[in-house]
Swiss-Prot record:
<dbReference type="GO" id="GO:0015797">
    <property type="term" value="P:mannitol transmembrane transport"/>
</dbReference>
<dbReference type="InterPro" id="IPR036259">
    <property type="entry name" value="MFS_trans_sf"/>
</dbReference>
<feature type="topological domain" description="Extracellular">
    <location>
        <begin position="216"/>
        <end position="229"/>
    </location>
</feature>
<feature type="topological domain" description="Extracellular">
    <location>
        <begin position="351"/>
        <end position="356"/>
    </location>
</feature>
<dbReference type="GO" id="GO:0008645">
    <property type="term" value="P:hexose transmembrane transport"/>
</dbReference>
<dbReference type="GO" id="GO:0008643">
    <property type="term" value="P:carbohydrate transport"/>
</dbReference>
<feature type="transmembrane region" description="Helical; Name=9">
    <location>
        <begin position="382"/>
        <end position="402"/>
    </location>
</feature>
<feature type="topological domain" description="Cytoplasmic">
    <location>
        <begin position="446"/>
        <end position="462"/>
    </location>
</feature>
<feature type="region of interest" description="Disordered">
    <location>
        <begin position="530"/>
        <end position="551"/>
    </location>
</feature>
<protein>
    <recommendedName>
        <fullName>Hexose transporter HXT13</fullName>
    </recommendedName>
</protein>
<keyword id="KW-0677">Repeat</keyword>
<feature type="transmembrane region" description="Helical; Name=2">
    <location>
        <begin position="110"/>
        <end position="130"/>
    </location>
</feature>
<dbReference type="GO" id="GO:0015578">
    <property type="term" value="F:mannose transmembrane transporter activity"/>
</dbReference>
<keyword id="KW-0472">Membrane</keyword>
<feature type="topological domain" description="Cytoplasmic">
    <location>
        <begin position="506"/>
        <end position="564"/>
    </location>
</feature>
<dbReference type="InterPro" id="IPR005829">
    <property type="entry name" value="Sugar_transporter_CS"/>
</dbReference>
<dbReference type="GO" id="GO:0005783">
    <property type="term" value="C:endoplasmic reticulum"/>
</dbReference>
Length: 564
């Protein structure tokens, strides 16, 4: 067994252990690099960052992450629209017995869910633009599509079907952003900050939800179409922020190297790290990315068929991406965010809009905590603690709703004390969700796949998120109308399944580059042992030597056992 292996076995925190360092290794390729250059990656230190360095990184990444604001804004304003009188008058039905307009369960479900259908399709359609046009231009295109959808919705008048068509197109753009923005963030972010920077996407989603709640709260007393058209009109401001921002942010160095644009790739890495393109750290990063690209090319051209490859572990990662994004919706979060105003009116609150603003505030500030800690705690711990915390809160929320909210039956008055308790545990639930699953699910999907199939795999994973959001958004009015707060127990069962899946199947990737994550999967490390895995480059051995050493060690153990 090598000295590197001994160090791994004897040290608990092996990723930071003082381990054997290999001598410089000559490069075996020359695409875009000086043939005489020697890359001694183990001895190259990352650039030291002061306050200005961190500020530059976050400012460059923020316009990309603002793509998360678009679906968040829709969630916030839609939750208010379904309770607005003028909106119901324009797109609802008239009830002669009461003399009021209302939205049927079908129409309400479609109003909420059509956006999700558009997002699912948009992610699948537009993700491939990232490989042909680049990440930045692809984001600009999907934002323009989003603006077209907003125009169709605003121009709708007493035509609910026109509004729904606009909602789908609106979703196409937002869905494209849900794939492209985390993708670009994960590819330009420094390894030690990647989790927090990808989490900015979710932070902006919560910011969009919060401001959406505030906008409908501000327009709810208008007695004309401005009640809902003003919040929709603000979409153009958010879209312009993203388009202008794309002029300032660097392109993905991985995309640039795949296109043989090596100088631009080094400039991109240098810009995000605020150093010279000739800095040794920049050369090392470009060298590692180039190695990964060349290794992927040796496997042939990318295809949809490759997503089902067992040999390269892509299928395993695709299943993980699909399940993590599915579980994100099965936490039950959109039960509160889409129908929050309606839910809290049912617990006796006269102004559900105000409660929605409170929930939006908790959601936003909790996500700020996630941005700060996700690169310190790790992905697995965040997801495990989050599932356990949400499970406890949902059990209490559902139990109070079932047993205590209506002490004299569903037709009787609600208990104010029980209603207040439900709001408190809803806030605890949102805290657990926003600090864990909300950002980490996007991180896991953004960093799990090799660049060769990344756009395809991310689009499928994210489409599953939107598909489940559609199902929950559409069927929730029917389910709650039938089983009321027993619905919460359905999500409890899902949370139990989530906890078990993460523990047994999801590896830890904190502190690893995207290329090192590829090696983690190739070596077949058990997920519950993955936190102590050390990349070959830090052990002082190559990837091939690592695989050979692992096989030899297994043979040695088998021989020893037979000898006994």
């Amino acid at each position: 067994m090598s000295s590197a292996q001994s160090s791994i076995d004897s040290d608990g925190d092996v990723r930071d252990a003082d381990i054997h360092v290999a001598p410089p290794v000559e490069k075996e390729w020359s695409d875009g690099f000086d043939d005489n250059e020697v890359i001694n990656g183990d001895n190259v230190e990352p650039p030291k960052r002061g306050l200005i360095g961190y500020l530059v990184i976050y400012l460059l990444c923020y316009p990309i992450s603002f793509g998360g604001f678009l679906p968040g804004w829709d969630s916030g304003i839609t939750a208010g629209f379904i309770n607005m009188d003028n909106f119901k008058m324009n797109f609802g039905s008239y009830k002669h017995s009461t003399g009021e307009y209302y939205l049927s369960n079908v129409r309400m479900g479609l109003l909420v869910a059509m956006f999700s259908i558009g997002c699912a399709i948009g992610g699948l359609i537009f993700a491939r633009l990232a490989d042909t046009l680049g990440r930045r231009l692809a984001i600009v295109i999907v934002v323009l599509v989003y603006m077209v959808g907003a125009i169709i919705q605003i121009s709708s008048n007493h035509k609910w079907y026109q509004y729904f068509v606009g909602k789908i197109i609106y979703g196409l753009g937002a869905g494209g952003c849900s794939v492209l923005c985390p993708m670009l963030l994960s590819e330009i972010a420094p390894t030690d900050l990647r989790g927090g920077l990808v989490s900015l996407y979710q932070l902006n989603m919560t910011f969009g939800i919060f401001l959406g709640y505030c906008s409908v709260y501000g327009t709810r007393k208008y007695d004309n179409t401005a009640q809902w058209r003003v919040p929709l009109g603000l979409c153009f401001l958010w879209a312009l922020i993203i388009i202008i921002g794309m002029l300032l942010v660097p392109e993905s160095p991985r995309y640039l190297i795949e296109c043989e644009r090596h100088e631009e790739a080094r400039a991109s890495i240098a810009k995000i790290n605020k150093v010279s393109p000739e800095d040794p750290w920049v050369l090392k990063q470009a060298d590692e990315i180039n190695a990964g690209v060349l290794a992927q090319r040796e496997l042939g051209e990318a295809s949809w068929k490759e997503l089902f490859s067992v040999k390269t572990k892509v299928l395993q990662r695709l299943i993980t991406g699909i399940l993590v994004q599915t579980f994100l919706q099965l936490t039950g979060e959109n039960y509160f965010f889409f129908y929050g105003t309606t839910i809290f009116k049912s617990v006796g609150l006269t102004d559900g809009f105000e409660t929605s603003i409170v929930l939006g505030t908790v959601n936003f500030f909790s996500t700020i905590i996630a941005v700060m800690v996700v690169d310190k705690i790790g992905r697995r711990k965040c997801l495990l603690f989050g599932a356990a915390g949400m499970m406890a809160c949902m059990v209490i929320f559902a139990s109070i709703g079932v047993k205590c909210l209506y002490p004299h039956g569903q037709d009787g008055p609600s208990s104010k004390g029980a209603g207040n308790a439900m709001i408190v545990f809803t806030c605890f639930y949102i805290f657990c969700f926003a600090t864990t699953w909300a950002p980490v699910a996007y991180i896991v999907v953004a960093e799990s796949f090799p660049s060769k199939v990344k756009s395809r795999a991310m689009s499928i994973s994210t489409a599953c998120n939107w598909l489940w959001q559609f199902l929950i958004g559409f069927f929730t009015p029917f389910i709650t109308g039938s089983i009321h707060f027993y619905y919460g127990y359905v999500f409890v069962g899902c949370l139990v399944a989530m906890f078990l899946y993460v523990f047994f199947f999801l590896p830890e990737t904190i502190g690893l580059s995207l290329e090192e994550i590829q090696l983690l999967y190739e070596e077949g490390i058990k997920p519950w042992k993955s936190a102590s895995w050390v990349p070959p480059s830090r052990r002082g051995i190559s990837s091939e030597e690592s695989k050979t050493e692992k096989k030899d060690w297994k043979k040695f153990l088998k021989f020893s056992k037979n000898s006994d």
